[in-house]
Swiss-Prot record:
Sequence ranges assigned to domain UBX in this UniProt record: 273-350
Domain of life: Eukaryota
Places the protein is found: Nucleus; Cytoplasm
Record lineage: Eukaryota, Fungi, Dikarya, Ascomycota, Saccharomycotina
Alphabetized SMART domains for the sequence: UBX
Species of the source: Saccharomyces cerevisiae (strain ATCC 204508 / S288c)
Protein name: UBX domain-containing protein 4
Function: Involved in CDC48-dependent protein degradation through the ubiquitin/proteasome pathway.
Name of the gene: UBX4
PANTHER family, per the entry: TETHER CONTAINING UBX DOMAIN FOR GLUT4 (PTHR46467:SF1)
Amino acid sequence: MPMVTVKYNFQLFKCKVSLNSTLNDVLHQSIQFFQLHTSSNDWSLIHLDKPVPLDLPWRLLNLPTGVNLELSKSSNFPVANKTNREDIPFNTIKIRFQIPGRDSVVKEMPSDQPIAPILRQMSGAAGDDFKIQVFSKIIEFKTIKDENLTLENLGIQEPSSVRLIFNNTSHSEGISANSAIHPKQTPPTMTNPETVASLPPHELHKPSVFLPSDEPLAVIKDQIEDEEDYELTVEQAKKYQKMLSSKAGTLGGPILTKRLREQSANNLPKKNKAISECLLRVKFPDRSHIQIAFKPNEDMRTVYNVVSQFLIDENMPFTLNQSHPFKPLAKDDKKLLDDLEFGSKTMLLFETNSNSNGPLIKAHLLEDAQKITHETRTTPSVNTINKSNPQGPSDNATSIKKTLNRVPKWMKLSKK
């Protein structure tokens, strides 16, 4: 923190200042330290035989740290002399009043004129229940009114900005209503078709049936899609960088041990993602799947009732189990999100005591069923959902690329 030294009659006074504080505060502290029972307007701080502005923040004064300032009477300097300006009109200073909810207002006013009437005019219907902010200071309007303060008393000697802070909520609502009459026109945002798009929510309690593929697993593994699907996105890079920084500490900081990492992780608030729907996929013994969307506040009793509606035998006794860790879920009033802590997508296992190994789902639902591998191939990624796909679904087998027989660019040898 910068240090300022004030000299007066061979005495020294050292004071610490912040970057946003003004030398007007230093002047008041110096007068109190040297026990000068006069007004602060009669004194000024001198540096290199010139008065220093008292209304500018420290970071704008361009003064070195530990600068030596001299406390002197303002009568010794005609610029700050108040008694010698009786025949000279006071300076007119431009002040910009910033009012929340309205445009800024610029007014010219003498530096010796009380600012309470002008502030009352600017505040409108707020009355006396507001404050003003000058640089880093916040002053009540009642104090300005009672002490009859002027711009000189506030340390303002040059064009400055004054912010009005209202405490009354009704006045702020009135301002927002006035601003709503003349809304600001914002230019329309341009959207890129290749930007990330959010998938629409699923229809609640509507089933989607998926059947296992007839192709061997070896054939499915050899079917490699386009290499663009494996490119690292910006979100994935940020997530990976955050994981590395949490393990090794931030750049330039100390390396955190395992205990400190666990302690910092426990101190962080849990940021629960806003889940709008719980997508449950039930796997049957014949490897068929049925996918149903539920609300997060629905219970397991509703899940059991909805799943039983799509069975051939609706009165069949069955049990839904959590896949990992394996846990039977009872038909009770436990909420999906609050009690069972289900995510946006959850897999459940269907278990029954019936000896039937055939299809358990109704026939009209099986007619519209999709292959599981077909779903994973044709479903576009979120980042490329708006990209055009000129090829139809029928020639998926021909569009699949095999990169095992291709030579990468970095492995090609030069012909020289």
